[in-house]
A protein has these predicted regions:
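Conserved PLP-anchoring active-site segment centered on the Schiff-base-forming lysine
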Residues: 1-10
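Structural motif
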Residues: 3, 49-54, 85, 113, ...
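A short helix->loop->beta-strand "cap" motif at the edges of active sites that frequently abuts
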Residues: 21, 77-82, 108-109
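Short beta-strand->loop structural element characteristic of the AMP-binding/adenylate-forming
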Residues: 22-30
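Active-site phosphate-binding strand-loop segment of PLP-dependent enzymes
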Residues: 32-95
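Conserved core segment of the aminotransferase class I/II
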Residues: 107, 112-175
Length: 178
């Protein structure tokens, strides 16, 4: 069983559905806050193996978890030994550089972090990453297999964008527009 914050990206929901994973949606309260009582109730009544949460920004609302809510959620999940899959796809769109990411409060041994460049560069940059302390070799193998299917020209273009600081300039403009 996987608990996801709701609203949740429909692509993620479809992937979980395709993998025949049981999904329980946990609606966010106004302001993007997680209902701690409801979460604790779910963790006690269900066999929750994984919780999918946003790192900084929760889309499509554009809200972020207040610091005290982040810490309380992390404490609850740690107490129950629940793995967390942190969606870091929209963090770069947050205005401030001082935003605390949820992973700052989580047990790194029960954490996976994923993100993509596609959300802020565009569909022509279908590149992403997954971070994990435990599955590094397996994840690296999967990413290498996928890399051979992607155009080397695209890979070089993204590398130049990242290496030349142009991505940071692009993000500044994008944040102002949002």
């Amino acid at each position: 069983t996987v608990v996801v914050e709701s609203p949740c990206d429909w692509v993620i929901l479809r992937l979980l559905e395709a993998a025949e994973v049981r999904v329980i949606e946990l609606p966010l309260l106004p302001g993007g806050v997680i209902d701690l009582q409801r979460l604790e109730s779910l963790l006690e009544s269900e066999t929750v193996r994984l919780m999918l949460l946003s790192s900084v920004l929760s889309m499509p609302r554009g809200t972020h978890l207040p610091l005290n809510n982040q810490q309380a959620v992390a404490h609850l999940l740690g107490r129950h030994g629940t793995w967390v899959l942190e969606n870091d796809c929209y963090s770069e769109l947050h205005e401030g550089n001082d935003a605390q990411r949820l992973r700052d409060w989580l047990d790194p041994d029960r954490l996976l972090v994923f993100s993509t460049f596609e959300k802020f560069v565009g569909a022509e940059a279908p590149f992403g990453y997954v971070l994990s302390r435990h599955w590094r070799n397996e994840l690296q193998r999967h990413f290498l297999l996928r890399a051979f299917r992607l155009s080397p020209i695209r890979q070089k273009a993204i590398a130049r964008l990242l290496g030349g600081g142009r991505l940071d300039q692009h993000l500044l403009i994008l944040r102002r527009m949002l």
